[in-house]
């Protein structure tokens, strides 16, 4: 591949060795880093300095906001300034030190996004504690594992998560000694905590512990671990990703350089809506960037049904979303179009085509059709508060048709990105006003080197004219390893390169397109990982089936499956339920499909599977998977790419049918 418009080659590719290492493609980096990666300023040593420098620079800027509740109704956003937040952070840090917790100790944070979440994080940063975020949606089992694995001694928790935290006792109390509520503590919770020899504090009570005391902040280094972020898990236990101060500050410098170069730099005037989980790297680094630029962060009320009300009240300028959220926006707009009548639909379609055509010619979105923006698309922009200029999509692929639609109607830049917890978030980001990048994650951010590694067993060649292979990343943003799992670290970290497991394809302009997974683990559109082999083993317990292939499209939020049913079991069921016909016609019958789906749901409930692991559509094939159709290997292992190719029509039909059902609902 000739060097694309947005990348430069820094190293040549290498042919592989027969029976040894596979071939690797050339090493590329962002065109904006052709003279080297941006270096952080000397006084930016740790994550604490990100906040400290903004307090010094913009003490009176509004930093953290939440809606005031008056007579049970949500009012305007009420703000704490950077200086006010700093004062609380110092008090909280003094209290932490007063109970004997200090540099290098592990501090958990458990709950939905809130000002207290950020304040707790900054107190950890100030005193060199390892911040260990806990997913808001994780149950007691996973929380217990993380507390014990990370050896968390102090945990801050949202009020309604205290009971979940207490359920981790007595195992967790080998390490966990203190719990601090973001709000109040009930008498029952105090009794339960004392029963397990845990000390529990309300927020105000804990802040008073450090009154009148002063502790010097410890010296921090860039190589110090800042946070242990546990991945949401695929098979087995969650993995603790060690991210250092260096990882975070180099990530921020790279993103800052990119946004400045494309004239979309964040400033202290920007307003960000915090609703994606802070325990996820995507939102965490975006909020760190907002803090770095002394911008304002407003928090939602934690209910997706009233998210749109919070958006209207906050009027954010930057909006981040996972594809599932943008899919809902798209579906809602399409529904309004359908309900709007012939004339409105005709006007909308005309305006859309006109603006889209001008954008294809290279016109920036704001110049492509100002009249259409004012007359037709204004309501879409107002639906996002009226001030949004930048929409960032991450955590899973965004469907090209949705990205294209939103780029036109949202009157804002819609950028898709790609990154891993292990790469400290953003590694690729698409470029504004480049419609050729639809369906891609854009070129590399100017802080990493990228190369593809061939995957011969899947037919991907990194040295071909159309380079495809496993995406490998090198740079200072990378994690330093999996906590207490050197074996897993060595599996993905080879010669300084992080092997992502994602298969990518370089585009002519230097953008990257994600096309496959090297291992049978993938993400659904809401960003959840699915371990497909594990699920197939679980669903195989259903007596009515012989074999099953589970599939999840990264642009959809649920799973579907192709099943080879048991002839004996299905015909027996059909006889009992008066479903007539031969075996093939019985398998085509919708009642039979609903029966199989019901059996899957029964097993899923028994095995306590998560919602996104449920199968929502099924195709029954009376012919078992075989070698004649190249669907299995001689050792009877499934050939997933071939299965997808063979059943593509059925897969598309299942997703189409489910979408139609959702629209009717």
UniProtKB/Swiss-Prot annotation:
It comes from the Eukaryota. Its cofactor is Mg(2+). The keyword ATP-binding applies. It catalyses: a long-chain fatty acid + ATP + CoA = a long-chain fatty acyl-CoA + AMP + diphosphate. ATP binds at residues 228-239. Keywords: ATP-binding, Fatty acid metabolism, Ligase, Lipid metabolism, Magnesium, Nucleotide-binding. One of its GO terms (biological process) is fatty acid metabolic process. Residues 495-519 are annotated as: Fatty acid-binding. Its EC number is 6.2.1.3. It holds the Pfam family AMP-binding. The keyword NADP does not apply. Pathway: Lipid metabolism; fatty acid metabolism. CDD domains: LC-FACS_euk (cd05927). It is an enzyme of class 6 (ligase). GO terms for molecular function: ATP binding; long-chain fatty acid-CoA ligase activity. GO terms for cellular component: endoplasmic reticulum. Transmembrane segments: none annotated. Belongs to the ATP-dependent AMP-binding enzyme family. Activation of long-chain fatty acids for both synthesis of cellular lipids, and degradation via beta-oxidation. Preferentially uses palmitate, palmitoleate, oleate and linoleate. This is Long chain acyl-CoA synthetase 3. It comes from Arabidopsis thaliana (Mouse-ear cress). The gene is LACS3.
